[in-house]
Amino acid sequence: MSLCEDMLLCNYRKCRIKLSGYAWVTACSHIFCDQHGSGEFSRSPAICPACNSTLSGKLDIVRTELSPSEEYKAMVLAGLRPEIVLDISSRALAFWTYQVHQERLYQEYNFSKAEGHLKQMEKIYTQQIQSKDVELTSMKGEVTSMKKVLEEYKKKFSDISEKLMERNRQYQKLQGLYDSLRLRNITIANHEGTLEPSMIAQSGVLGFPLGNNSKFPLDNTPVRNRGDGDGDFQFRPFFAGSPTAPEPSNSFFSFVSPSRELEQQQVSSRAFKVKRI
C-alpha cells in the first residue's frame, strides 16, 4: 500500500475518524479533527490529547485545510528558495510518514491484542470442549447403562405381564366355576324349598299331627270278631310304633325338623299297611 492511499485519522483516542476538510496539526506531529481540535485547544495552555505535551508556541498548533484550492497551492510556496521548499516538503513528508507509521503500529498493537485474546479464548474454549467431551463420554456410558437397565425392566415387565395374564385367566376360570356352583346351590335350595311345603301338606292330609308331642294314632282298623262269628267288625287299638316321650310341661309349641317328620310318616305308613294285611 502506498503512502498516498493511506488516510490520516484523528489522533484523539475515542474518535479515530478519517480526516477531511480542516484539521488541527501540532508541533509534536499529531493531528486532530476539527471538532476535537477546536474543543481541546481552546484552553490555555493547550495540551496535546495524544502525548500530553504542552503547546505554548505561536505556531505549535495550526489549523490547516487538507484539500486546498489551486490558488493556495500556487501561492503558498511562491518566492521561496528551493532549499526552503525542499525543507518544508521534507518536513511535511516526515509528518505524513510518522502518522502512517504510528497508525500501523496502533493497528498492529490492536491486532496483537486481539490475537492474544483470541488465543486465550481458543485455549479456554479448547479446555471447555475437552471437558464437554469427557462429560459427553460419561453421559454416553450412562445412556448405555440406562439402556441395559431399560431392557432388563422391559423383560421383567413382559414376564410380569404374562404372569398377570395367566393369573387373570385362572381368576376368570375360578370365577366361572364359582358362579356355576352358586347357581347350582341356589337351584337346589329353591327345589328343596318347593318340596318341603308339599310334604307338610301331605302329612296333614294323612292325619298325622306335627310337633314333638304328637303321638302315632291308634290303629282303628276293623277286624273280624272271631268269638261271635256274626260278621261284625270291632276296633282294636294298635300303636304303629313306640309313643314318644311326653313333652315337658313348660313348652307350649314344639317343632320337629322336616326330615324327622318325614321319617315318622314313613314308619306310620308301613305299620298301617302291615296291620291291614
From Swiss-Prot:
It holds the Pfam family zf-RING_5. Highly expressed in heart. Detected at intermediate levels in liver and kidney, and at low levels in placenta, brain and lung. Pathway: Protein modification; protein ubiquitination. The keyword Ubl conjugation applies. The keyword Mitochondrion does not apply. Ubiquitin E3 ligase that acts as a limiting factor for crossing-over during meiosis: required during zygonema to limit the colocalization of RNF212 with MutS-gamma-associated recombination sites and thereby establish early differentiation of crossover and non-crossover sites. Later, it is directed by MutL-gamma to stably accumulate at designated crossover sites. Probably promotes the dissociation of RNF212 and MutS-gamma to allow the progression of recombination and the implementation of the final steps of crossing over. Interacts with CCNB1, UBE2L3 and NF2. This is E3 ubiquitin-protein ligase CCNB1IP1. The lineage of its organism: Eukaryota, Metazoa, Chordata, Craniata, Vertebrata.
